[in-house]
Amino acid sequence: MAANPEDFSGWLEGNVAAARRHRGAEEEEGEAAEQGRTIKAQQAGHQPVAMEMTSTDSTNIFHLHDRESKDHDDGLSYTYLSSDKHYISHPDSTYFTGISKKETESLDKKEFSGAGPHSPKEIPTFDSRGLFSSDSGIEMTPAEWSDVNRSLADPIEEEKLEACKYIDIRRSPDMKSQQVVDAGFGANRSNTISQAAPTEQQTYDSVTMSWQKDHYNGNISEYLPYMEEPREDFGLYHSPTSKEPKSAPVTITFTGMETALQTEYPGNQQGKSNKGLRPSPDLVPTVTVSEPEEDSPESLTPPSTDADGYAEPCGSEKQREYGICEDELISAIKAKEGTKRFSSETNDEKQSRSFHAEKQDFTVMSTEATSASHYTKASSAESGDSEIELVSEDQVGAEEAMQSAYMTFSHISGPPPSPASPSIQYSILREEREAELDSELIIESCDGSSASEESPKRDPDSPMMKPMIMDIIEEENLSRTESFEASDFESCSLKEKKLNMENLAESASYLKGKFPAEIRADMPSTKKEEFLPQKKSPEGPAYQSKVIGMTSILGPKPLTFFKKKAIDLLYWRDVKQTGIVFGSILLMLFSLTLFSVVSVIAYLALAALSATISFRIYKSVLQAVQKTDEGHPFKSYLDIEISLSQEQIQKYTGCFQLYTNSIAKELRRLFLVQDLVDSLKFAVLMWLLTYVGALFNGLTLLIMAVVSMFSLPVVYDKYQAQIDQYLGLVRTNMNIIVTKIQAKIPGTKQKE
């Protein structure tokens, strides 16, 4: 059947016109989509990304394939994403937060290149603000944190928040390019970085990406274990399906770098579609990221890692490989703990929804590793369960940090919380410790403060009388500026010094070097009774030093009791009691002058027995006459338990040991002439005692000492001013004489 030429010509012209109209409509759609992307990129503060189609012949520049694979790739094209503009980060941002931005503009259905109506969806956008770290960290975060209120205001959009993703990337021991295979790729493939198939209940909320570059050769030494997969009804990539995976190489290069590394990952290859951009096994998608300026502002360092570069996940991330970090989410996000992940959706649900790649705008920023990064001083406060983590970096820490890379995906609901002031924590701990010490000192010195009128008294204006518990800031300033004299340090006991040292040690161990603090470990507290007394005791400084030395052995209670009794007796506060004691001692001593020691002991024992037996017979006769039964006359004294506990014996033995050791050391020092002047003084004293011994015996000297003990304190208390004046004159003359002697004796001029 012959066709009419005119009809065929008309039909051909109609088809050509229809094809031109269709092509014009597609060009208008492309221009509208490109204009929409440019407007949205400008609104979000992103740089536009150009999409180019180029041949794989140029891949040899980037070392993508070897010579064998290059022969099979001739003539093929791939998608090339590039950005020829450097994104200048905001220098005033130090904390980075992000949340998915909502689409506010109504776009034409033609822009979506998909069938069916499409409501505005949350399109994940990325914004980098000050993401330049000294340790070569690269972070990608969504836009300003102020968008949180807008995103969470809609309860429907609240249901779309998705779990955080955390991927830990290790460094190869040989520091070379290597292929990294994700062990759990088949089961956890839906948790990859480029999942771009959000549903009505789930969508990506925010993404934080951090990379690290090789510290030694300037190359990327870490690879991202993920694969982006093509989809029939979707432009670029979509969630994985159950189809058989195939290999598709992915290359990430940095402009300005001499070489680039490549890593191949398994991926799913589906049937081709004429809608959108999609890679095939023959296409090689390449992402080129521009290097920022060297004077980029510093950023937060990545989370603290251990020696092998492992970053500790937070929250429920410890329970599974890709968990949900809910520490920084507000209450609305916490309610979504049971939200299903992308992997739980069926293939039908994934294929029934379409995501439009024309509405995505990504900005990838990377930091440049230079020698100046070694001097970084930035630190990060890793938020999570209110835990403060301050990281101080040094040369070694920077080199160890270069051995690892990491990638984190997290929801951030707002600005990170500011870390608590370390000085306040230290002040609270110090205040509690000093309050405990002060309470113990008050209890121990309570009895000694009311023992007698001559007890040491503190000046009310003295710094030690001020309350130990004060305002935190005032106490911190006082602890760093207050100073003590040497005499105050000498009067402190060893026990208090030990307690104060433990206090400072606990404070230092709690902070772990997180902040510099001026710790003064030589500022112990002092007990009340250990201050130098305002009024001298009758026995002078030597007696005071002995009493203070007995404090750590006998304890406060025995010392206080005996000290009170001795003061009452020596100052004749109770005349009757003092008279009985003084008379008994003198009687015994005078008896020793007339009789031997054995005779004196025997006579004293017979006298005591005569008195007690006589009193016992007298009471018995009296009870028989009066026909009463009062019992034993000494029953009350017999009921008193007279025994020394083990603790008391140890205390008295310790006191005796202290005096014995002191005397032995002093005699050794004098007889072995450790100090020539002191040895000469001791020799003069012994020479004078020879004359005293010729005139008086030991008992006479002992009687004179007892009389002096019970008389001199009263006389000194009454005529203290005059006695001090004469004692000062005597001391001055003695010092002059000793100085003259030292000047004449060789070898003694160096002594003070």
UniProtKB/Swiss-Prot annotation:
Region (Disordered): 1-57, 264-319, 334-424, 444-465
Source taxon at top rank: Eukaryota
Keywords, in A-Z order: Endoplasmic reticulum, Membrane, Nucleus, Transmembrane, Transmembrane helix
Membrane topology: Multi-pass membrane protein
Domain Reticulon: 566-752
Tissue: Isoform A and isoform C are both expressed in the animal hemisphere (presumptive neural ectoderm) of blastula and gastrula stage embryos, and along the anterior neural border, in the panplacodal primordium, and in the dorsolateral side of archenteron roof of late neurula embryos. At the tailbud stage, expression of the isoforms begin to differ. Isoform A localizes to the cranial placodes including the trigeminal placode, lateral line placode, olfactory placode and otic vesicle.
Protein name per its UniProtKB record: Reticulon-1-B
TM segment ranges: 580-600, 684-704
Taxonomic lineage of the native organism: Eukaryota, Metazoa, Chordata, Craniata, Vertebrata
PROSITE patterns: RETICULON
Compositional bias annotation for Basic and acidic residues: 334-361
Matches recorded under Gene3D superfamilies: 1.20.5.2480
Nucleus in keyword set: yes
Protein's UniProt keywords contain Repressor: no
Function per UniProt: Inhibits amyloid precursor protein processing, probably by blocking BACE1 activity.
GO terms under cellular component: endoplasmic reticulum membrane; neuron projection; nucleus; postsynaptic density
Induction comment from the UniProt entry of this chain: Isoform A is repressed by thyroid hormone.
BP-aspect Gene Ontology terms: brain development; endoplasmic reticulum tubular network formation; neuron differentiation
Listed Pfam families: Reticulon
PANTHER family named among the record's database cross-references: RETICULON-1 (PTHR45799:SF5), RETICULON-LIKE PROTEIN (PTHR45799)
Extent of Polar residues compositional bias: 264-273, 363-383
Subcellular location per the Swiss-Prot or TrEMBL entry: Endoplasmic reticulum membrane; Nucleus
